[in-house]
Design a protein with these regions (language model features):
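Cys/His-coordinated zinc-binding microdomains
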Residues: 21, 55-58
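Conserved, aromatic- and glycine-enriched, well-ordered alpha/beta core segments
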Residues: 31, 36-52
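Polybasic, low-complexity binding patches
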Residues: 41-48, 59-97
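Short, charged/polar surface micro-motifs in flexible loops or helix N-caps
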Residues: 25-26, 37-38, 58-60
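Short cysteine-rich loop/turn motifs with clustered Cys
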Residues: 2-33
Length: 97
């Protein structure tokens, strides 16, 4: 991993879960979620196309709570991956195409 990617992922994690913050649940430790929108079945998105999610909103929360338990319902509940990516990029002051 490049140093710039490592720094970016550290800054992402330091934000805390974007969903918890949007729901006024306070700061929660974040894992890195590489967005799936526009990716092939077994491809991982570039590190710059990642959002910070707590373990509940990332993988453990169940249907409608965790993105990996049902992305379409999760996006109806919390916003699309691309909307949240745009928010994160604005907060970090970075903009990637």
């Amino acid at each position: 991993m490049k140093k710039a990617d490592s720094l970016h992922l550290s800054r992402l994690a330091a934000l805390g879960c974007i969903v918890c913050r949007n729901q006024n649940l306070g700061e929660t430790p974040a894992e890195i979620h590489h967005i799936r929108t526009g990716q092939g079945a077994s491809q991982r998105a570039d590190h710059r196309k990642s959002i910070p999610l707590c373990h509940m909103h990332h993988r453990n929360g169940g249907y409608g709570v965790a993105i990996h338990a049902g992305r379409k319902q999760w996006e109806r509940n919390f916003g699309t991956e691309l909307q949240l990516l745009e928010q994160v990029q604005l907060e970090l002051g970075v903009f990637y195409a």
